[in-house]
A protein has these predicted regions:
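Serine-esterase "nucleophile elbow" of acetyl-processing enzymes
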Residues: 2-78, 96-97
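Structural recognition of the beta-strand scaffold that forms the well-ordered cores
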Residues: 30-35, 39, 74-78, 105-110, ...
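Solvent-exposed loop/turn segments at secondary-structure junctions
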Residues: 37-40, 79-85, 113-118, 165-169, ...
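Acidic/histidine-rich helix-loop elements
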Residues: 40-57, 78-86, 123-134, 216
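Oxyanion-hole/transition-state-stabilizing segment in secreted/luminal serine hydrolases
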Residues: 86-137, 167
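Generic structural signal for well-ordered alpha-helices
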Residues: 143-148, 180
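Proline-centered flexible-loop/turn and helix-kink motifs
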Residues: 155-156, 191
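Catalytic His-Asp segment of secreted/periplasmic serine-dependent ester chemistry enzymes
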Residues: 164-223
Length: 223
């Protein structure tokens, strides 16, 4: 056995050595997945009248696959169509997601897909790191509020922020890279906060990708 095969090597990319057992996610006992449809195991349905419907099937979400693979507890703090603004203003409160009894050792935040269509992006300067009540009402401000409120609940939690992949949003494609850069800038403002850089490392969302990983016009659970 070569023990080096279990260690990160210089220059190794995040997709170069995939771990079927959940990898180092297993060091956490609890994880919360904050996000939209892409954190919710979404399925697009086309009914007999040609009308599209969208369904959250959390058991198919990548968070629950991590839970089963790594043997940890994962909470889906997510819903299709979610934005950072809605999460802060009503969704999390209505679902009890600010409840300290649901405090997690780690959180993933996968938001921006819908935000780029509905709100000013702003910048990381919209965040008052001393008091989230002073954050500006922009995507960046609400995004920062989410981190800060969960840090109040679990000060030692680790946060993993997901950027947006290229090619998934044709409506506001020009906002995808700026939104991803804001997410990177937000991560720099907080301790124990890291970036899962899908924009940099994810395979391109091209026609072949869509054929394999889409149901209609929406990513399927595998995608």
């Amino acid at each position: 056995m070569d023990i080096r095969s279990y260690m990160a090597s210089p220059g190794e990319g995040p997709l170069d050595n995939l771990k079927p057992d959940g990898g180092l996610c297993g060091i956490f006992r609890t994880m919360g997945c904050i996000g939209d449809s892409l954190s919710s195991g979404e399925f697009e349905e086309l009914d007999a009248d040609g009308v599209k419907h969208y369904h959250d099937y959390y058991e198919y979400s990548w968070g629950q696959y991590i839970a089963r693979a790594a043997g940890i507890k994962v909470y889906n703090f997510s819903k299709g169509g979610m934005t950072a603004k809605r999460y802060c203003e009503e969704f999390a409160e209505s679902r009890g997601f600010w409840n300290p009894e649901l405090a997690c050792q780690a959180y993933t935040i996968a938001l921006a897909c819908n935000d780029v269509n509905h709100i000013e992006l702003g910048s990381a300067d919209d965040i008052d790191v001393s008091d989230w009540h002073n954050n500006k009402p922009t995507f960046a401000g609400y995004y920062g509020q989410i981190i800060m409120r969960y840090k109040e609940i679990q000060p030692k939690a680790r946060f993993f922020l997901l950027t947006l992949p290229h090619g998934f949003n044709s409506k506001n494609a020009d906002k995808v890279s700026p939104a991803s850069q804001i997410i990177r800038d937000v991560a720099d403002k907080f301790e124990w906060t890291y970036v899962v850089d899908l924009e940099r490392y994810l395979p391109p969302v091209d026609d072949d990708f869509r054929r394999r990983f889409y149901l209609g016009g929406h990513l399927n659970a595998a995608g």
